[in-house]
C-alpha cells in the first residue's frame, strides 16, 4: 500500500507540474498577443499621421538609433491621441523633430596634435 501511495503522490506532482507549465505557456501567449495588439495599434496611429516618406525616415532612424525612433514615435502617438496633430506629417517634419531632439546632444571634440 505504501508503494501505491508513493506512486499516486508522484503522479499528482507530475500532473501539477504539467498544469503549471500549461498555465505559464498560456500566460506567455496572452502577453505576446497583447504586445502584438499594441504594436498594431501604434502602427495604425502612425499610418494615420505620417506620410510614407516620413514613415520611411523614421524606420531608417530606427536602424541606427532605435531609442530615438521609439522616443519620436511615443511623442507623436501621444500628440495624436490628444488631438494636437491635425494633418499628415511629412519627412521634413520628422527631420525637424529629430534635429530638435538631437540638437542638445554634445558632440565629442577630437583634437589632433602634430609632433
Curated annotation (Swiss-Prot):
InterPro entries documented for this protein: DNA_bind_arc (IPR022889), PDCD5-like (IPR002836), PDCD5-like_sf (IPR036883)
Residue ranges, compositional bias (Basic and acidic residues): 26-41
Q: What Gene3D superfamilies does this protein map onto?
A: PDCD5-like
Q: Locate the region Disordered.
A: 1-41
Any one Pfam family here would be dsDNA_bind
Give Gene Ontology CC terms: cytosol
Q: Which SUPFAM superfamilies match?
A: Double-stranded DNA-binding domain
One GO term in the molecular function aspect is:
DNA binding
Record keywords? DNA-binding
Q: Where is the composition biased (Low complexity)?
A: 15-25
Which family is annotated? Belongs to the PDCD5 family.
Quote the NCBIfam families the UniProt record gives. Answer: PRK04239.1 (NF003268)
This protein's name: DNA-binding protein Ta0052
Upper classification of the source organism reads: Archaea, Methanobacteriati, Thermoplasmatota, Thermoplasmata, Thermoplasmatales
Amino acid at each position: 500500500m505504501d508503494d501505491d501511495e508513493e506512486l499516486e503522490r508522484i503522479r499528482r506532482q507530475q500532473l501539477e507540474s504539467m498544469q503549471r507549465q500549461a498555465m505559464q505557456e498560456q500566460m506567455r501567449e496572452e502577453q505576446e498577443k497583447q504586445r502584438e495588439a499594441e504594436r498594431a495599434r501604434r502602427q495604425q496611429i502612425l499610418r494615420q499621421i505620417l506620410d510614407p516618406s516620413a514613415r520611411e525616415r523614421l524606420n531608417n532612424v530606427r536602424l541606427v538609433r532605435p531609442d530615438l525612433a521609439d522616443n519620436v514615435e511615443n511623442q507623436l502617438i501621444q500628440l495624436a491621441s490628444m488631438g494636437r496633430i491635425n494633418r499628415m506629417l511629412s519627412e521634413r517634419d520628422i527631420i525637424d523633430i529629430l534635429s530638435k531632439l538631437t540638437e542638445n546632444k554634445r558632440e565629442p571634440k577630437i583634437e589632433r596634435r602634430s609632433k
